[in-house]
């Protein structure tokens, strides 16, 4: 299952291992279209192999700004 992170927990949740970060927003159509694909991927791959996290850019602008996110969806 994908994990939702916020600015306050981002560093802690992404500090170890291989992490795929999904920068998204609730109003973003393409973000909503790719969400089921990322969810399926998270179910097929163990968290030890790849951790998938989501961060809402509207509610967590600090992290989005830190990574220079200019458009969404963006995967890092």
Enumerate the predicted regions with their spans:
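N-terminal "domain-start" segment that seeds a small globular fold
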Residues: 1-13
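Short active-site neighborhood of thiol/selenol oxidoreductases, capturing the structured segment around
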Residues: 14-26
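Structural signature of beta-strand start/N-cap positions in the alpha/beta core
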Residues: 19, 49-51
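A short, hydrophobic beta-strand/beta-hairpin element that forms part of a small beta-sheet core
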Residues: 20-23, 38, 63, 73-76
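The canonical Cys-X-X-Cys-His
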Residues: 28-31, 75
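Typically the conserved alpha-helix immediately C-terminal to a functionally engaged Cys/Sec
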Residues: 32-46
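Structural microenvironment flanking redox-active thiols in thiol-disulfide oxidoreductases
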Residues: 47, 55-64
């Amino acid at each position: 299952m994908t994990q939702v992170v916020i600015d306050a927990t981002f560093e802690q949740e992404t500090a170890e291992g291989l992490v795929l970060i999904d920068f998204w927003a609730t109003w973003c159509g393409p973000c909503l279209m790719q969400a089921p694909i990322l969810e399926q991927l998270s179910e097929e791959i163990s968290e030890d192999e790849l951790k998938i996290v989501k961060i809402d850019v509207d509610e967590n602008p600090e992290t989005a700004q830190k990574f220079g996110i200019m458009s969404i969806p963006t995967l890092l």
